[in-house]
Amino acid sequence: MNYNKLEELSYQEVKEIAENMSLRIRRNKEDMLKDITSAFKDYERYKKSKSDKYTRVKQIGEKGKEGITYLVKTKSGSEYAMKTFRAQKSSSKLLQEVELQKAASELGVAPRVIDYDTVSKYIVMDKMDKHLLDVMKKQGGVILKTQQKQIISIYKKLDEANVFHGDANPLNYMFLGKQLYIIDFGMSKKITNSLIKKVGTSTPNIHIMTLGLVLKLKEMNCSPESYEYLKKFLSEEQRKQFCI
């Protein structure tokens, strides 16, 4: 940042910057400029110290709606997945995503959150092995019944934890060993009375996510075998309406 340009500003302009940064308002411009410059330098040092904690090794998967996920390594050699966000991602939204993923991870259905930063906009978590879609390819394009049971188990636990995931994209399911996890809580919401009233069910993961996933699998022309167990959790009305 070019701090010299700040000196070209008027007292009133400098005062407005100081107010926006919650800094002390001083009687002369020079003192306020020192405070502003010091605050910016502290911020830059903070960002550098956080970014230096992790070395980006490679991109994981495709670029998402909100940003990119990387494989990162710490100085001690530990490897994690870092989900980065665009600058527009608000701190409150990022914190909400962290909170809901932590709630899910405590139940063993989502990657554990290792670290996060609302300034540099990232969440660091345990890295997974492979996507469900990659596993499906090796299985002849189908989801095994045992894997469908894991998905339903995930949905039930999320409902119990009052966390509505909200995105049934098959890309949001990953394995660590043989254990299936759900990832990307960017669209997740807390299950509240207002949400229950809006969606018409107190178990939206079972009743909405299951339908969403089955429809995605049908759209991908997957064998009915891939959702034979899943569709047992759909209502008769849902099955008739969507020809499942």
Predicted regions and their residues:
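A conserved alpha-helical element in kinase catalytic cores
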Residues: T84-Y116, T146, I191
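Juxta-kinase regulatory segment immediately upstream of eukaryotic protein kinase catalytic domains
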Residues: S38-Q59
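Conserved structural core of kinase catalytic domains
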Residues: G108-Q147
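ATP-binding glycine-rich loop module of kinase domains
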Residues: K58-Q59, K63-V98
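Conserved alphaE helix
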Residues: I143-K157
